[in-house]
A protein has these predicted regions:
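Glycine-rich loops and low-complexity Gly/Arg-rich segments
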Residues: 30-32, 58-59, 223-224
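Hydrophobic alpha-helical membrane-insertion segments
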Residues: 1, 63, 197-198
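Alpha-helical transmembrane segments in multi-pass integral membrane proteins
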Residues: 15-20, 46-50, 90-225
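Membrane-interface helix-loop-helix regions
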Residues: 1-37, 69-97, 161-175
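Feature marks short, surface-exposed loop/turn motifs that line or immediately flank catalytic pockets
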Residues: 10-12, 65, 206
Length: 225
C-alpha cells in the first residue's frame, strides 16, 4: 500500500481499510494527484501537439461532462446510486465506473481550459489583481450549500457556474497581474508550500478521526483543542 502511495498508483478495492473506497487508504488525496499525473503524461505524449481548435473542442466536451456531473444529468447512466452527493461534484477517489467518470469529469475541464487560456494568451490585467482574486475566491468558497429537495439543483448550477466561468476568470486575472514588494515573498512561500501541505495533511486527519472515535465522551473543547 505504501509503495502504491509513493507511485500514485490506485490500490485494489479489496485493500480498502475504512470502507471509504479510496484509491490509497494511507493518503486519500493521492487520488487527485493520480489524475493529474495521468494528464501530464498524456500532455507530454499527445496533448501538447493539439491546435487551438482541438483544445476548444475538448474544452466544450469537458464542460459538458462537468454539467452532466453537477446537474446530475447522468447521460451515461452511472450516477443512480449517488444520492448522497447529488447536485455536487463530490467524488472521484475510487476505481468503480461511476467514480472514474467523476474523476475524469473533475479533471478535464480545468486542465483543458487552462491549456486553452495559456495558448490564446488572453489575460486580464487589473490593478491589485492579487487582492481581487483573493476576494473572489473567498466569496465563492464561503457560499453555503444551496437548495434542498426539489431545489437541490441550484447547488449543482452554482458549482457549474464556479467551475466553468468564475475559476477560469480568476486564473486569467491572476496570470495577468503581478505583485511587488513584500507580497512577492509571501506569495512565493504560500505557492511553494501549498503542494507539500496538500499531500501530507490527510494522514493527520486520519489520526484525529481515530483519536476522536476512541474519546467520544470527552468535552467538545477537548476535541477542538
Amino acid at each position: 500500500m505504501m509503495l502504491l502511495g509513493f507511485t500514485m498508483l490506485p490500490a485494489l478495492s479489496k485493500w480498502d481499510i475504512r470502507g471509504w473506497g479510496e484509491t490509497n487508504a494511507l493518503n486519500g488525496p493521492t487520488w487527485s494527484l493520480m489524475w493529474e499525473y495521468l494528464a501530464n503524461i498524456l500532455y507530454a505524449l499527445f496533448i501538447r501537439h493539439f491546435s487551438k481548435t482541438m483544445l476548444g473542442i475538448f474544452v466544450a466536451f469537458s464542460a459538458f461532462l462537468t454539467l452532466n456531473l453537477a446537474l446530475n444529468l447522468d447521460v451515461f447512466g452511472l450516477f443512480s446510486t449517488r444520492s448522497y452527493a447529488i447536485y455536487t461534484v463530490i467524488g472521484g477517489w475510487s476505481t468503480t465506473p461511476d467514480q472514474l467518470c467523476i474523476g475524469i469529469s473533475r479533471l478535464l475541464y480545468p486542465f483543458f481550459a487552462g491549456l486553452l487560456l495559456s495558448r490564446i494568451n488572453k489575460l486580464i490585467k487589473v490593478k491589485a489583481g492579487f487582492w481581487w482574486c483573493s476576494l473572489l475566491v473567498a466569496a465563492l468558497l464561503v457560499a453555503p450549500h444551496f437548495g434542498t429537495g426539489d431545489t437541490a439543483w441550484i447547488n449543482g448550477a452554482y458549482d457549474a457556474f464556479c467551475i466553468l466561468l468564475m475559476f477560469p476568470l480568476i486564473v486569467s486575472m491572476g496570470a495577468g497581474s503581478s505583485v511587488t514588494g513584500r507580497s512577492v515573498k509571501v506569495c512565493k512561500f504560500f505557492g511553494e508550500i501549498s503542494y507539500p501541505l496538500y499531500i501530507t495533511h490527510y494522514p493527520l486527519i486520519y489520526m484525529q478521526v481515530a483519536w476522536a472515535s476512541h474519546h467520544k465522551d470527552l468535552p467538545l473543547g477537548t476535541h477542538i483543542c
